[in-house]
Curated annotation (Swiss-Prot):
Tissue: Expressed in seedlings, roots, leaves, flowers, mature siliques, shoot apical meristems, leaf primordia, inflorescence meristems, young floral meristems, developing petals, carpels and ovules. Low expression in stamens.
Cofactors (names): Cu cation
Quaternary data: Heteromer with ETR1. Binds to MRF3/ECIP1.
Chain's role: Ethylene receptor related to bacterial two-component regulators. Acts as a redundant negative regulator of ethylene signaling.
Places the protein is found: Endoplasmic reticulum membrane
Source organism: Arabidopsis thaliana (Mouse-ear cress)
GO terms under cellular component: endoplasmic reticulum; endoplasmic reticulum membrane
Family classification: Belongs to the ethylene receptor family.
GO biological process, one term: negative regulation of ethylene-activated signaling pathway
EC number(s) recorded for this UniProt protein: 2.7.11.-
Protein name: Ethylene receptor 2
Length: 773
């Protein structure tokens, strides 16, 4: 609406101003009423000539401007092109008007005047149209100006934001550089000094210091500083200081006054004029904080150079905050690493100790294995050979005295064999027992004979007193009973060797009266399968008596048995005897007994009492029973008819044992072929060998062989269902028996191999094989 009103007002003003001019001039052009001054420069002719030249020059200028505008419009995307085209037309018409006007100063034809008039009218119309168009464009141009102002403002804001971004980028660069330098080391002192140096370089600081709380938490101590202190001697600030309290309570950077005590101390202790602006921030010490939520803080103080109007900027404060956080984390990591390093060193030390203990254990195991091998080769195998030979001698026709001596030798050999076996089984805590029927009277008689020999050899008199009412047929471990009795005799005789007037009293009696069944030491004896009527308790008491002192009564010994059962000896008895007594006591407990000791005045044992429980065994009936002992060989002269002519292959790596076992088998009537290894055994029974493999009916196999043990040989034999296998082994428990049964071994004889044990096992194996067939 405003644009239309402005256009009509412009047209109306032109009509108002042009009409009077036309009326005044009567419709024609005014004529100049000038006087020509003749020869003057400003003569009429000169003026007209000058105007004509000016018109031509104006026309040339007007014609050149449209060319430039046309080139500009064609080369760029300019808004309002139609306005520019109006300007071009207006300028061209103006140029034509001036050009034609230049020809009218002299005599000219009517057509020129007519053309001049037409172009002038066109110029007037175009100029009016252009003016009207400009009126409509002015508001748009004003909007463009406003937009220009807005763009300038936005450009200014953008420049400011770019500046902030550049500042942040620079700050980030400094922070990354400082963080990288801080994290290069894992030592806390190096971390702090690196922080001080790099932060001072980055921010151009005069000094930089770290304050930490003392052990009591009452003061802040200056612990790390970039530059040494000057004349100011204070290096501690109280925790109650206002600046310290303000810093510790705020997590922001605090700008301190130069008069502050912590600021002066951090600035090197010099003049206040030499210190610039001071900033401080707390650093949490995570590793020394308690679990109640109370944190411990260190303080980082940064001092700007003095004598300059420089102050802390936002960028510098942000750098200090980030560096403080990074230092806190780095110190915490360093503390964790120190603890880890200490733990690693402790673990390494423990590992070295474990390795040393492992080597010691390995050496001990090797020494034990060497000891066991030596004991086995040097003592156990020869003892087994001797016992085997003695078993053959027992089968000969001997007088009663000779038979008693041989039987005593066999019992003593069994004790020796048990001792050797126990010495090898002590580290494992295993002591084997073998419960079987035996004659108690014969065992007591043989033990008394052996004790008498020991006493006479040591110059001590020996007395024996055994009740006639003692049962004879009992069930127990005969070898262990004999071993314990000999140990007691040796323990009493050895400390009094060649002592004048000493005598050893050996008494055996049946325990009468009721025992205290609630005693924990007797609780292990009782079992649901046994009743009180089927058990018998026998007490073996040995007492050393001197002629010049009254002997200890056996009744008192029996009454004090419960009190002194766990006595350990000292003095002359010694640590070795004490250990031996401990082993003996363990053996006694295994055979359902208890042992007690009464020490003498010198600390050596004076009285020892052994109480054992045996199972009663019914007397042998005329028809025999399942528990009856094997029939005597002389009473049954044809008992070996089953074994006579039996083809046996004997496999044993020990020459002496192999020879003794061969003699035993030959005495039983077997035809024996002996080999010294498992390979020779497999070769001997293999098809196509020089030996007739089908003639071997039984293979007697030693399980403890060096190159190829008996288990592997037995498995190879059983893979083709070859002859019956009877194994010989040192120790036989339920686990070993199950293993032998799984492999296919038909029978097992425990070493030492004696005649009757071998005969009984071979007979059982052959009868079982016949029943299966």
């Amino acid at each position: 609406m405003v644009k239309e009103i402005a256009s009509w007002l412009l047209i109306l003003s032109m009509v108002v101003f042009v009409s009077p001019v036309l009326a005044i001039n009567g419709g024609g052009y005014p004529r100049c009423n000038c006087e020509d001054e003749g020869n003057s420069f400003w003569s009429t002719e000169n003026i007209l000539e000058t105007q004509r030249v000016s018109d031509f020059l104006i026309a040339v200028a007007y014609f050149s401007i449209p060319i430039e505008l046309l080139y500009f419009v064609s080369c760029s995307n300019v808004p309002f092109k139609w306005v520019l085209f109006e300007f071009i037309a207006f300028i061209v018409l103006c140029g034509m008007t001036h050009l034609l006007h230049g020809w009218t100063y002299s005599a000219h034809p009517f057509r020129l005047m007519m053309a001049f008039t037409v172009f002038k009218m066109l110029t007037a119309l175009v100029s009016c149209a252009t003016a009207i168009t400009l009126i409509t464009l002015i508001p748009l141009l004003l909007k463009v100006k406003v937009r220009e102002f807005m763009l300038k403002k936005k450009a200014h804001e953008l420049g400011r934001e770019v500046g902030l971004i550049l500042i942040k980028k620079e700050t980030g660069f400094h922070v990354r550089m400082l963080t990288q330098e801080i994290r290069k080391s894992l030592d806390r002192h190096t971390i702090l000094y690196t922080t001080l140096v790099e932060l001072s370089k980055t921010l151009g600081l005069q000094n930089c210091a770290v304050w930490m709380p003392n052990d009591g938490g009452t003061e802040m101590d200056l612990t790390h500083e970039l530059r040494g202190r000057g004349g100011y001697g204070g290096c501690s600030v109280s925790m109650e200081d206002l600046d310290v309290v303000r810093i510790r309570e705020s997590d922001e950077v605090n700008v301190l006054s130069v008069d502050s005590s912590i600021a002066r101390a951090s600035g090197g202790g010099g003049d206040v004029s030499e210190i610039g602006a001071v900033a401080a921030i707390r650093m949490p010490m995570l590793r020394v904080s308690d679990f109640n939520g109370e944190l411990s803080y260190a303080i980082l103080v940064c001092v700007l150079p003095g004598g300059t109007p420089r102050d802390w900027t936002y960028q510098e404060i942000e750098i200090v905050k980030v560096v403080a956080d990074q230092v806190t984390v780095a110190l915490d990591h360093a503390a964790v690493l120190e603890e880890s390093q200490l733990m690693r060193e402790k673990l390494a030390e423990q590992n070295r100790a474990l390795q040393m203990a492992k080597r010691d254990a390995l050496r001990a195991s090797q020494a034990r294995n060497a000891f066991q091998k030596t004991m086995s080769e040097g003592m156990r195998r020869p003892m087994h050979s001797i016992l085997g030979l003695l078993s053959m001698i027992q089968d000969e026709k001997l007088s009663d005295e000779q038979k008693m001596i041989v039987d005593t030798m066999v019992k003593t050999g069994n004790v020796m064999s048990n001792l050797v076996g126990d010495s090898m089984d002590v580290p494992d805590g295993r002591f084997g027992t073998e419960m079987k029927p035996f004659s108690l009277h014969r065992t007591i008689h043989e033990a008394a004979c052996m004790a008498r020999c020991l006493c006479l050899c040591n110059g001590i008199r020996f007395l024996v007193d055994a009740e006639k009412s003692l049962p004879d047929n009992v069930v127990g471990d005969e070898r262990r009973v004999f071993q314990v009795i000999l140990h007691i005799v040796g323990s009493l005789v050895k400390p009094r060797k060649r002592q004048e007037g000493s005598s050893l009293m050996f008494k055996v009696l049946k325990e009468r009266g009721s025992l205290d069944r609630s005693d924990h030491r007797w609780a292990a004896w009782r079992s649901p399968a046994s009743s009180a009527d089927g058990d018998v308790y026998i007490r073996f008491e040995m007492n050393v008596e001197n002629d010049d002192s009254s002997s200890q009564s056996f009744a008192s010994v029996s009454s004090r048995d419960q009190e002194v059962g766990d006595v350990r000896f000292s003095g002359g008895y010694g640590l070795g005897q004490d250990l031996s007594f401990g082993v003996c006591k363990k053996v006694v407990q295994l055979i359902h007994g208890n042992i007690s000791v009464v020490p003498g005045s010198d600390g050596s044992p004076e009285t020892m009492s052994l109480l054992l429980r045996f199972r009663r065994r019914p007397s042998i009936s005329v028809h025999g029973s399942s528990e009856s002992p094997a029939p005597d060989h002389h009473a049954h002269p044809h008992s070996n008819s089953l074994l006579r002519g039996l083809q046996v292959l004997l496999v044993d790596t020990n020459d002496s044992n192999r020879a003794v076992t061969r003699k035993l088998l030959e005495k039983l009537g077997c035809d024996v072929t002996a080999v010294s290894s498992g390979f020779d055994c497999l070769t001997a029974i293999a098809p196509g060998s020089s030996s007739p493999s089908t003639s071997f009916q039984v293979v007697v196999l030693d399980l403890q062989m060096a190159e190829m043990d008996g288990y592997e040989v037995a498995m190879r034999i059983r893979s083709r269902s070859w002859p019956l296998i009877v194994a010989t082994t040192v120790s036989l428990d339920e686990e070993m028996w199950d293993k032998c049964a799984q492999i296919g071994i038909n029978g097992v004889v425990r070493k030492p191999v004696v005649l009757r044990a071998m005969e009984s096992e071979l007979r059982r194996v052959l009868l079982q094989a016949d029943q299966l067939l």
